[in-house]
Each structure stands twice: as structure tokens, then as C-alpha cells.
Amino acid sequence: MTKALFYLIFFLALFGNTFFLYGFLPEPLAVTTEISIILLFAIAILSKIGRGQVPRWHLFPGFLMICFVAACSMFFNQTEPVRAVFSLRLLYRFYFLYLALINLDLDEKTLKKFNFYLLILLVGQLPVVAYKFYHQGIAETTMGAYGRGGSLTAMLPVAMIFYMSAYYFLEKPRKLYLIIGLGFIFFSIVGAKRAVLFFYPIEFLAIYYFIYCKGKQVDPFRKAGVLILSIFMIGIVSASILYFNRTLNPEQKVGGSIDPAYALSYAIDYNTRENELGYTTGRFSTTRRIFSVLYNDGVSRLFFGFGPGAYTVSILDPQGSHRQIYQLEKRLGIGYGVTSMNRIALEYGVLGVVAFALIPIAFCFICRRQYRLETDPYWRAFAGGSMGFAFAMLAFFVIYHFPAFWGDTLPALYFYAMAVVYIRSRKANQTSVQQ
């Protein structure tokens, strides 16, 4: 039962939206993921209690804190309770998947089966991207089978490249890992994602230092050849992005000239600009505008935001909630660039941001610690990839699009990976105590 629910949750996370879009599955089944998580959570907790054991509630104080913040925000903003429930449900549903997984006492064999299943689903995105590329060319709609959420075309490859690099350097240098990694670089380029121009150089240098040098205990000054190769790889990939992305070259076409100065100027303007009506259309300008309004509106607004659900579409009243979001955007003067941090700030204020940020920050520390302690090559590679994933998600939380934590796909993968690292860390702690 638990395995079937797991397989269903992640199949829907990576392929479900395409099935809904083309009518292979009826739209009401879109709530199947949440029902499956509830069932899995209930099975895990009740099984734990049935064996006379205390369930693990890792990071649960952060959830209680945001519930308290939500209650205060509802009071100050006169928000309907149902809107708060819908908002918290979307934000924390995969955290409860995390709690379910860490309470199921999954053994190593089962975890490896789950990892392999997810690898198949993730690699299965590449043929879908190739098919869409054949029919659509280089475009933001050239994405995987998850069907929506264009920003995933940048974030998902970043995560996969961390894992493939870790397994190549720390487990076994299989060519398959390189091929999959290159496939996801292709994935992001044909998906026309500008952000990877800046993500990849940082990621490749992080892989070189933290996974290759630290992981293999190599002196970076004695392996300058690998560093040179990394820099060369950064140059090739960056040049390819500039050449193929219409918005990053002066000619505004696929196959334009490679002009880093133009691309940098465009990126700065893109992230800081406002349109002719004064609406912010960049992530940095939108972040500045949101926190400026929260600050200027007084202490209660700064701490508790505009109310849970203020920026969330309700399935009970989609038209009404869309109008509410439009009015809020009009009041703030924002048009584009809402990050996960921004969205939480809008609904829950600064205290909500602090409460939720405890999760990605804690996961960074857990992954870093486990990466240092893990001795098994397979699991050390997993910990190394997860460390990269955790720090990337912390960055996405602050500076990138909100599907990083509010979506259907990446949060499922993220909380699964963090659950596995936590399970391994518990096992390591138990082993050290026994010794």
C-alpha cells in the first residue's frame, strides 16, 4: 500500500499534468496527490503508534509557528478560515509527505528502489522535451511532461546536474551519468531559460570544489586541469545559451551573436525594471516593492502580511480569488517576479517568511553534515547531490519563481530527497551510539 501510494504521488508529480491536459485523466483526479499524501501520512503515524513508538515530528515547530502567524494574520486581515486552509495546504502538503517518509522506517533496499523509480521518471522527461523541441523549437513551452511551470525548466536541470555529477565523481564514473547531465543542460537551453546562464557557472564551480575536491579529498591546486576543464565547460555552455536564446543576444534570434555584455545588461534590466504604468516586472524590483509596501503599511502588515490565501487561487471560488489577486497586484504595483519568499511575505508577512525559511535552512545543514559523515559511495553521492539541491532550493526560495515551493513537481522531489538524507543521518547516529 505505502509503495503504491509513493509511486502514484511521484508519477502524478512528473507526468500528471500532461495526462490532465490531454484528457487522459479527469480533472477531479488532480487532488489525488494530496489524498495520497494524507493516506501515506496516516499509515506512517498510526503504524508508528501501533508499534508503541513515538512518531518523529522533525521541523514541526516551524509548522506550528506559521499556523500561529496565520491565525494572527487572519485576525488582523479578517481573512476567512477556508482561505487560510487552502493556502497552508498548498505550502505544506509535501512537508507532510516528508513526515510520512521519515516515519515509515524504510530500509536501504526500498530507498534504492524509490531512487531508481524517480530516476526513470526524471530521465523520461528528456524524450518529452525532445518531442516538443521538434515541434516547437526553442521556446519556454518546450518543457517536460509535468506540463506547466516553465521555471522548472531551469530548476530541475540544476538539481539533476548536481546528482549526476556527485554519482560520477563519488560512486563510479559511468558515462551514463554524463549523458543524463548533458541531456538536462540541453533541456534548459531548448526551454529558453535565461536564468541558467547565471546558475550554471556557480553550479559548475560548486561541483568542482565541494563534490570533486572535497568529496575526493583532492588538493584543488594540484588538479588545475579539472578546474580548467570546468571553466571551459562553463564557457561552452554559456556561449550556447547566448547563441540560442533570443532574448540574450542583440539580434533577438536563435543563432545570434555571443555578446556577454549585452546579456548582462539585459539581465540587470529584466530583473530590476518597471513598465510604463509603474508596475514592477522583475524579481528584484518586485521583491523591493513588496517589502517596501509591507514596511510602510505598519507593524501588523509587516509581520503578518495581507492574510493567508491573499495570493492563492481558491478552487471554491476561482473567479473571486483571481479578482482578489488582481486587486492586490494593482495596489502593490507588481506585474511579475513573485518568488516563494515574496508570496509567503504577501500572505504571512516577515514572520511567515522566517517560519518557513527554517525548513530549507535546516535541510542545508543536515545535508552538509551527512555529506561529511557518509562512507558508503552510493549514499555519499546521494548526500552530495542533495547538498547541492538543498542550497539551490534555498537560493530559489529567495530569488526565483514561486513553483520552487508552491508547485506540484519540485517540492515533491525536494522533500523526498531531504527525507532520505534525514533517514540516513538517523541511521548514522544509531550506528555511532551502538559503537
Regions found by a protein language model. Give the residues of each.
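A membrane-periplasm/extracellular boundary helix in multi-pass inner-membrane enzymes
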Residues: 190, 213-274, 295-297
